């Protein structure tokens, strides 16, 4: 994650962006957090949506097939069974990711869900997951080093990341704020776009003053 944070920091410099607010969802939230810890002078704040903020001891079932450390095995599966497995498990995977909310209408096409069926997507997603699991311990325990305005939005019924661990514990350790949406799940950017928009805009207003 530190490597990806470094890429974003270089992009900010190259484009001469003046301290942007960084928004991150799920694993993107972990990358945003790494950016804030390593390059706090380049950003104005964080708006985190259902972020992965703590070490994951148990990989969620829908990602277990992606947790492959061997590059050779990853390449083999990507070009043989991954698409078939993805098709067979697509319905259950989507339902778990969105639970307890309904899957967004036509998520496979309009939401890009079926893009995950490609060999290239399988390889990159697997790499990201493995790298995230290995680098997460380097961030955990540094919550008190967070020096930029930060607020977290979480779904109370998130089945991918535990709100108490990744949301409430993180907020307590870092001294930052959290808003929990009752009865909502992990895919808030798609199921609760108005809530997310209001959340992000409020942080933009706060960090631009």
Task: Report each predicted region and the residues it spans.
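Active-site acidic short loop of glycosyltransferases
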Residues: 13-19, 40-41, 147-148, 175
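Active-site loop/oxyanion-hole signature of alpha/beta-hydrolase fold enzymes
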Residues: 1-23, 59, 198
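Conserved alpha/beta-hydrolase catalytic His-Asp/Glu region
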Residues: 82-145
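Catalytic histidine-centered segment of alpha/beta-hydrolase-like enzymes
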Residues: 184-193, 197
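Conserved loop-alpha-helix segment in the C-terminal half of the alpha/beta-hydrolase fold
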Residues: 150-184
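Gly/Ala-rich beta-loop-alpha elbow adjacent to hydrolase catalytic centers
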Residues: 24, 28, 32
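Flexible "cap/lid" loop of the alpha/beta hydrolase fold
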Residues: 37, 46-79
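Residue in the alpha/beta-hydrolase core beta-strand immediately N-terminal to the catalytic nucleophile
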Residues: 21, 44-47
